[in-house]
Amino acid sequence: MKHIVKNILTNKERKKLIKDCEPYLLSGKELSKKYGIDITFPAKQTQEQIYNIPCFTDPINKILLASANTLRQSLVLKRVWINCTSGKKEDVLWHNHIPMEWSCVYYMKTLPFVDSGTLFKDGFMRAPQNSLIIFPANLDHCPPTSPFRFKRYSMALDLVRTS
């Protein structure tokens, strides 16, 4: 089951998050080099341990709280990173987050009616800017393409239930 939670951060917090992430965004080639693997990641992304960076702590905690309250489960954060896509086809890579239990996408900055949401195999799930989609991690998904070269910022989180 997929869930949408709206109004996660204040507008000031959301804009600060966008500004704060800029120096941490890496190209796919830079990210591959950092991880020491021969895969080119799509678009620009941060590394997946940004929870260790103080400027991201509060927004991540708000998203975790919203996720735990929505799912009515105690959750542990396993990975979190930020994506910056521009609607290009090369930014699209169908994927899932197995073996995680839950995945979330928080929409930091989107273009309404164009790229505000996530494409799943069963269709596009629309979600407004400053909202969160929570879904089972085994679902294949990708960011939508767009004819506009507008920067779309999203934060991805992988979660598991506490034992």
Residue ranges and their predicted role:
Residues 73-145, 150-163:
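Catalytic core of non-heme Fe(II) oxygenases with the double-stranded beta-helix
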Residues 1-73, 91:
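Non-heme Fe(II)/2-oxoglutarate
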